[in-house]
Amino acid sequence: TRTEISCHARGSYHFFPRAHSLVDIGGQDSKVIKVDDRGNRIAFKMNRKCAAGTGAFLEEIANRLKVKVGRLNELAEKATKDISIGSYCTVFTATEILTKIRENVDLKDIVRGIYQSVIQRIMEMDTLEGEVVMTGGVAAHNPFLVRMFEEKIGRKIFVPPLPQFTGAFGAALYALEAKGG
């Protein structure tokens, strides 16, 4: 039996065999996975029980801002200021955002601040060593968040094709290997 974690590692290794750190930001959780030179999982850390820093978090924030979740990337790209969104809880973040709106902070800057908050949460989970791969729906639908992350760590982050399916692809590779393919 293969775990979700090992399947993400296998799928990522197929595309980026030199990567040693994987960041997966999905709908319900986010994780940092460390792999060895053969793509085997050696360690992983997962976000807290709170949804903050996940795709569900971004959907909730989009609802609170009364924008479609698909517009978040476009808004963040057009931001002109860096603002801090510091809360670690979706409920508290929503309250913090309402305060920013009342203070007439531009919506674009708020969304950029939310992206920075997601990145900060990931970086607090574990160090990112060597080449870094990002998978999950957040990477698929928020390419500007990936670029912001690259700026934060000072190096390129590799994103596989259809990153939201990397774990499923890894599972398929394991199944193929088990059949002798």
Can you describe what each PLM-predicted range is?
Residues R38-K81, L173:
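Glycine-rich phosphate-binding loop plus the immediately following alpha-helix
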Residues M123-K152, P163-Q164:
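Glycine-rich phosphate-binding loops at beta-strand->alpha-helix junctions
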Residues T1-G26, K31-N40, M123, G170-E177:
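Conserved phosphate-binding catalytic cores of ATP/NTP-utilizing and phosphoryl-transfer enzymes
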Residues E4-I5, E150-F169:
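Conserved phosphate-binding/catalytic loops in two-lobed NTP-binding clefts
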Residues T90-L128, Q164:
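Adenine-nucleotide phosphate-binding core of ATP-dependent small-molecule kinases
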Residues T1-I5, S21-I25, A43-F44, R71, ...:
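General beta-strand structural signal in soluble alpha/beta enzymes
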Residues G55-L58, P160-G181:
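Glycine-rich phosphate-binding/hydrolytic loop that grips phosphoryl groups
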